[in-house]
Every structure is written in C-alpha cells, then in structure tokens.
Amino acid sequence: MIGLDRRVFLRWLGAASASAATPLLAQQAPLDPERSAAQLIKPQTQAAIDRGLTWLAGRQNEDGSFGGTGYSRNVAVVSLAGMAFLSGGHTPGRGEYGRQVNRCVSYLLAAEDDSGFICEPEYTSHGPMYDHGFATLVLAEIYGMSPDSDIREKLARAVRVIVTTQNPEGGWRYQPKVSEADISVTICQVMALRAARNAGLYVPNETIDRCVDYVKRSQNADGGFMYMLTGGPSRFPRSAAGVVALYSAGIYEGEEIRRGIDYLEQHRPAAEEFSRDTHAMYGHYYAVQAMWQAGGEHWQKWYPAVHDILLKTQQEDGSWMDLICPEYGTAMATIILQMPNNYLPIFQR
C-alpha cells in the first residue's frame, strides 16, 4: 500500500522543491514514471514491497533505530530504511509509514555531533563516512520535500563535513578527515552532495569537479572501476557505484558512461550471489539506479531480472537476508523494487 497517490505525491514534491532545486548540469528527458511503474510494479511486486516495509517498520525502535543484530542502531541502516519508506511515497507524518520516517529523522538529527558529523560511534562499522553519507542523503531528500529550519541547519553542517574532508585526489575514505580515497565511500558523498544541492544548499562547483575527475580516473580499461587509484581489478558492486557517481555529478552521457553500463550488463551477478556475497545487495542498489538513468532497453531488461531474484529470495516474514543484517537487506531490496515509482529527486534524471 503506497503512502500517497502518485500524481498527488509528485505534484506536492514538485511544489515543495521547484524553487530550490538546482541540477548540477542540464538533464535529459526522464523516463515516463507513470508508464514504468504501471508496467513493472505488478500486484505481486507491490505485495512483496508491502510485506518488506511492514517487516521493516516492525523492527524500528522507539528512538528511530533498527534491529538487534551487530548493526543495531547503525546510522547507515536507519538512513536506508528512511529511503525505503520515502521510495513508497511515505513522507514525514504522511502515509502509512509517516511515523517511521519521522523517527528516522529524529534519530539522525540527534546523532549529529557539534562538527556536523552524523554517526553513532558505539554502533558504527569501520567506515563511519558511509553512515554520514547515507544520513546526509536522506536528510537532504526530506528537507527538499518539507523544509524545516532545524533540518537545514544540521544538513548544512553535514555538507560542510563532506566538502572539507575531500582529499587531494577528489574522493573520500572511511574517516571524516583528509586521507586516502576509495570509490565505495566516495559515491556515498557524491549522492549526498547532489541531494543537498537539489534541495537548495550550497555545494562548491570545485568539489564536484574534483570528484568527477577522481571517479573518471578510477575507471579501468574494461569499463569497470578499481577500488582505489593505486590500481586493482574491476568488480561489479564498485563499478555500479562508479557509474552512479558520474550520473549523480551530472554526467549523463559520454564514453565513461557507455563503458560503465556495458561492464555492468556483462557482469551481472547470478541469483545465488544474494546469499553468499556481502556486497551483492549493495551492488544491485547502485546498478538499478545506473540502469534507470540509462533508460531504454538497459532499464527494461535489467529491472525485471533483479525483480525476479528479489521476489524469489524474500523470506516468509517479508524480510530479505543479507550478510550485514536483515534490516539493511530489506531496506535495499525495497528501494530497488520501488525504483519505478520515481518519487525521490535523487533517483530522477
């Protein structure tokens, strides 16, 4: 059950963000979201989404955090859960899961420290900049829909953290400081900056230009992406992230995009990867965004394939298993399945 009627939601979102949204570069015409959603989100698809969101909502604690596993109270998991609810049209205080979205926002705002860094040190992994990037992204999406002075103030500080910790190569690494860089952490920050700029916050052009240069230099000859500029083989998850980083920076066509899309189509993981690869859901989260942006036959062939895998791997209780935690897996899966909704600005062309 979606939160709001599609046309009502898109009109409301457009009215809320039209005056603030500033794209990084001129964009191509989008796919028709009405047609795509009607064709691809069938009743059984919506039923799977509903079961997933219901399970996810049931795992949320009163303070907005999620779960009781090793990633309980993790900021990135809270942020992705918020994105999952938003992707179904559930917005702060509106829709079936509006209350859950409000809790996510409250938890993330409370997790920001005096410097603007969003992280719960006791409940993070080895890479807290993942937490910060995902949190900044979802807060920017929410602020663009429903401007709030408290969110804007904290969001602006979070953006400054990203801008000031970019390293000389143009990327970011695990910690909120200038050091090394890798493509995986970098994509989180690029999407966060794109969302923030769309919502009307200042992001220096120089920051974007430097990260575009970093991502382009990370591409291997086969079209995939290396982990760090020191070299290394291409892998599907980080290659999907690399393509989306370019799209998020406003690069919608060109040789890098073409070769990246070709690589992804040639290296799509088999269905069994979902149960044994820590990065499988992560890779498909970015790959579905890349194919949505690529459009045409790329999208029309990609979504049904990953859709079928997700429906087959959903658990009886509505969740999706992942080696990180089921809350993470379920949030990722429901975001992927709801991509045709085209609700969120960060996923729009």
Model-predicted regions and their roles:
Residues 1-17:
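N-terminal secretory signal peptides and thylakoid transit peptides that target proteins
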Residues 10, 27-51, 65-100, 113-160, ...:
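An alpha-helical repeat/solenoid feature that recognizes helix-turn-helix modules
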Residues 53-60:
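Post-signal-peptide N-terminal segment of Sec-exported extracytoplasmic proteins
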Residues 63, 317:
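Acidic carboxylate motifs that coordinate Ca2+ or other divalent cations, activating on Asp/Glu
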Residues 98, 105-107:
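Active-site-surrounding "flap" and adjacent substrate/cofactor-binding loops of secreted or lumenal enzymes
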Residues 300-316:
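Short glycine/proline-rich, acidic loop/turn segments that cap or connect secondary-structure elements
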